[in-house]
């Protein structure tokens, strides 16, 4: 009763059960049904909804700055809420570092590795693995022209090999072996259980109990995974500074040596999650959406093949100039956000203000992209895949496009967003340059039928490739 009527956040609208206990939210999260549940709540209550006793959800574009941006002149900023625990003796990664000053210091060390200049140096590496993907498909259809491929696996193989090379100085060999390594399988397992860990970290005694009483097999798997990361990073560091990868650009700075080895291990681990699965997710979802909308696919193919005379012209710089490709990426990120439930923020003890309304202290604030991007408050025809909405003069000028922030905003936004865009453009365009793609028969809606545990649980997306008819 206290939470419903007298809690500091009780003035905000929302379902009574969610105001009474956070179990309703965590039940939706742990069962993979949080995306449709959040959409239903915002459709019923509007753009501000209380989804747990101390958690408020927003779908307004103006809420981004109020929640996530740095506010000059204010003594206290919104803080991070939950964190992804690092696997190296609880040493925080850049993502999970609670201290703003330390986060900013570490982030500044990594920024040169994700600059335009650095990404230009890394373009040959991106091309190398996107070409390996093209050749893997070619070998398959040369052996059997009716062979079906799982596009989800193909994209994961490619993004993990790219990020493995950038992070560890060596590929993981997924494209070469056409299979996941045990280390990558462990990453996917951890992603699926992330929703359960959110519940655990919401109740302070539980993390200690889980850690103390976890089965020995789980603890061993954790230690093996951690040691694998440590060994790979250490091998890379022993190679020196002769490679244009992340560690070269970090350690070549005098202050870059201020990172401890445990900090390097923790950040390498988070790079391998944030820089792989998310990019592959967008590519998988966009491929499905294009194949389900053949007229959109045809327009994109014509733009790619009609803009260049040879494969050598498909550079990240040239591809960034293609307007319909950019529109497709934006619409793909809207329809299928790789991080559908982003990290929330918590107001300082003195409280804060969102959308002109005072929010009490120690209240969690979030903008769930899986709900915001499907709200008819923000988009006309929100359940339709319409890349044209991102182009001028197409009748979608009233869309509140500022809500689309797939990489967040503010001092803790995604440091690797430019790398992600380069990967997405290069991988997708090389496939569409070389191949015509066809969706294999399937039941249901591959996209909307998915469960979501922090990230989407993707089932196989089976497709066929044939050599492009140019």
Curated annotation (Swiss-Prot):
Pathway given in the UniProt record: Mycotoxin biosynthesis
Residue positions binding heme: 414
Cofactor(s) it depends on: heme
NADP is among the record's keywords: no
One term of GO molecular function: monooxygenase activity
Transmembrane segments: none
EC number: 1.-.-.-
Protein keywords: Heme, Iron, Metal-binding, Monooxygenase, Oxidoreductase
Function: Cytochrome P450 monooxygenase; part of the gene cluster that mediates the biosynthesis of fumonisins B1 (FB1), B2 (FB2), B3 (FB3), and B4 (FB4), which are carcinogenic mycotoxins. The biosynthesis starts with the FUM1-catalyzed carbon chain assembly from one molecule of acetyl-CoA, eight molecules of malonyl-CoA, and two molecules of methionine (in S-adenosyl form).
Protein name: Cytochrome P450 monooxygenase FUM2
Upper lineage: Eukaryota, Fungi, Dikarya, Ascomycota, Pezizomycotina
């Amino acid at each position: 009763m206290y939470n419903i009527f007298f809690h500091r956040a009780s003035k905000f609208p929302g379902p009574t059960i969610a105001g009474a206990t956070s179990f309703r939210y965590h039940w939706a999260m742990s069962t993979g049904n949080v995306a449709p549940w959040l959409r239903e709540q915002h459709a019923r209550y509007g753009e501000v909804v209380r989804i747990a006793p101390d958690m408020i959800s927003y779908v307004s574009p103006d809420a981004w700055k109020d929640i996530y941006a740095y506010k000059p002149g204010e003594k206290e900023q919104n803080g991070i809420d939950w964190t992804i625990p690092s696997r190296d003796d609880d040493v925080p990664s850049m993502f999970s570092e609670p201290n703003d000053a330390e986060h900013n210091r570490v982030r500044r060390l990594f920024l040169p590795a994700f600059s335009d200049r650095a990404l230009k140096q890394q373009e040959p590496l991106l091309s190398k693995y996107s070409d390996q993907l093209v050749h893997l498909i070619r070998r398959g259809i040369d052996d059997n022209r009716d062979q079906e491929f799982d596009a989800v696996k193909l994209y994961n193989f490619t993004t993990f090999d790219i990020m493995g090379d950038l992070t560890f100085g060596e590929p993981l060999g997924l494209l070469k072996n056409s299979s996941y390594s045990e280390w990558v399988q462990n990453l996917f397992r951890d992603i699926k259980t992330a929703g359960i860990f959110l519940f655990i970290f919401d109740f302070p005694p539980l993390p200690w109990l889980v850690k103390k009483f976890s089965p020995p097999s789980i603890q061993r798997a954790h230690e093996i995974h951690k040691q694998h990361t440590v060994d790979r990073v250490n091998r890379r560091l022993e190679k020196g500074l002769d490679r244009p990868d992340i560690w070269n650009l970090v350690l070549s700075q005098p202050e870059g040596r201020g990172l401890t080895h445990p900090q390097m291990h923790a950040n390498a681990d988070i790079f391998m999650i944030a820089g792989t699965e998310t990019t592959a997710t967008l590519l998988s979802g966009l491929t499905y959406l294009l194949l389900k909308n053949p007229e959109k696919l045809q327009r994109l193919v014509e733009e790619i093949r009609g803009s260049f005379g040879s494969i050598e012209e498909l550079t990240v710089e040239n591809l960034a100039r293609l307007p319909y490709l950019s529109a497709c990426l934006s619409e793909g990120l809207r329809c299928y956000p790789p991080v559908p439930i982003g990290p929330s923020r918590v107001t300082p003890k003195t409280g804060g203000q969102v959308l002109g309304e005072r929010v009490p202290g120690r209240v969690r604030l979030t903008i769930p992209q899986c709900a915001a991007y499907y709200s008819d408050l923000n988009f006309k025809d929100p359940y339709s895949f319409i890349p044209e909405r991102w182009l001028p003069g197409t009748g979608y000028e009233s869309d509140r496009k500022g809500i689309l922030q797939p990489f967040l905003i503010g001092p803790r936004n995604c440091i690797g967003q430019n790398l992600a865009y380069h990967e997405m453009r290069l991988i997708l365009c090389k496939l569409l340059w070389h191949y015509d793609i066809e969706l294999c028969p399937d039941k249901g809606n591959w996209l909307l039928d998915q469960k979501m545990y922090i990230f989407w649980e993707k089932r196989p997306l089976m497709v066929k490739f044939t050599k492009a008819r140019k």
